[in-house]
Amino acid sequence: MAAITFTRKAAAELKERFQLSLEEAFANEADPLKKERLDQALSKLERCFLGTVHSFCAALLRERPVEAGVDPSFEELEELDDALLRKRAWDEYLLWVQVNKPEALAELEKIGCEPADLFTFFETILTYPDVEIVREAVPEPDLSQVKDELIHFLDWAKTLLPAQVPPKGWDALQELIRKGDRHRRVFDLNDPLQLIRLLNELDRKPKAVKNRWDDKDNAESVEAAFEDLKDRFLIPALQQWREYCHYILVSSVLPAVESYQNLKAEKSKLNFQDLLLQTASLLKENPEVRRYFQKRFTHLLVDEFQDTDPVQTEILFYLTGEELTEKDWRQLTPKPGSLFVVGDPKQSIYRFRRADIDIYNEVKRLLKQKGGRVLTLTTNFRSVKAVGRWINGVFKGVFPEEADQYQAAFAPLDTVRDDETGCLSGVRRFTLPKVKRHKISEIVEMNAEQIACFIQKGLNGCYKLCRTPEERQHGLTDIPQPGDFMILLRYKDSMDVYTRALEKRNIPYQIAGGSGFTESQEMRDILKVFQAVLDQEDPVRLLAALRSQFFGIS
């Protein structure tokens, strides 16, 4: 059996809970035959795999390195180390280009691109190595026609603008015409870069506000003419220019990609994406290896399936599909009982990593088509009924009744925990008094005080919380503890305001997922002291340090 989850923390918890469950079942089992089976399961626990998909792929590659074409002693490249290696490969490549291939830099300069601007493109290619890069040389486009048409339009449109600024200011179309006219008077539009910069500025959808024109017909005429200019000349010219630049950019970046791959090979390192791609290739191209691992892992369980990307999905189907020689994973039929996945499409938040609801829905469709069963879990064991009622009422109007390619369907929660009499439950709202001019700093201060005061009342026993049987077994009472509270902020820049409100009441707290510690007043004051020590000739920094809380000289 192999059980795969998304994070190392979740994998560690899964291992612990699985072993404890087996031990508890073994201790409580009276049937000799079942007890013997549980004993065997415990003794052979190491034969199961419980971990992340990347560690699972690493284990498969280490077991069949020859067929995979990898160094048997390869090491996994952690994300931080991988980022450092990418930066090293990029810096070394740029240095090599400056010394050995200055004409490549001249090509980039010709299209208005600095080498440093390409690092993000370089990283994107490395992140998706399975995506084929289009690399086709395109001649430099002739921009003379779009330049002439643009100048003609600006000359004509300018004459229809009001002589004075309208009372409510220029509308978006008027402002765009004025900006275009200024640009062509300051810069030489015979320079392709200056012309392209202007075309990019004009690639907008400005609307004319008729009451800001001397004649409403003029507003309509100019708006229609601008749309025609865009559709017939501006957009095609920009498209041709981008196609021309694309080949130059790709040609500039691919050698750096090769340099990075060589550095990895020299060190026998595989990053997370390599582990996935190498494993998918190993299983796709080797039916015998596929058969071997299918015998080894007869049952595959996958948690957090909504976080699975196309390559990971491919691996799952290769490991469970009956057709050993079929290379298209979509044509594979998982063996009955071999694949079990759990996922919540409403938690699909990794689209930037190609793990989105499209993959989830496609796998769901394929499994149903191949005879699999889809079970919807609606029972909520964590929340009390007051929370469930509120959630159902809010999200019924947010999610569609039927799932589509963009969004999961609404599924009402069936909460089983009852609200306890005398205990606080449900969703409440803090109401703030009206703040003059809606000054955000004052609103944040008041909100922080409200929340900290509410927490302090709970710690003092002014209200009680519902507890689960497990919480009571661990010694928790109805009286709230500091760990019962979580403050979620939309913006982290106000985090220090909330921490100060908690500190004022001696309420312990922990910051997660933010930079509040480095942005705190204490850290800013420490930085001022260090800056004064570093630059002792700067009187401004010295004064800032002396006025900090460490010296307190006003």
What are these regions (language model features)?
Residues 300-302:
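Walker B beta-strand of ABC/ABC-like P-loop ATPase nucleotide-binding domains
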Residues 1-20, 80, 84, 88, ...:
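Conserved motor-region signature of P-loop NTPase helicases/translocases
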Residues 116-270, 371-372, 469-473, 497, ...:
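Conserved ATP-driven helicase/translocase motor core recognized via long
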Residues 34, 286-287, 334, 362:
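Catalytic cores of nucleotide-enabled group-transfer and carboxylate-activating enzymes in metabolic
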Residues 45-59, 110-130, 249-255, 273-275, ...:
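Core structural elements
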Residues 69-75, 260-265, 374-377, 434-441:
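Short hinge/gating elements
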Residues 22-190, 270, 339-340, 431:
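Conserved ATP-dependent motor core of P-loop NTPases, especially the RecA-like helicase ATPase domain
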Residues 51-57, 251-298, 312, 322-324, ...:
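Conserved helicase/translocase P-loop NTPase motor core
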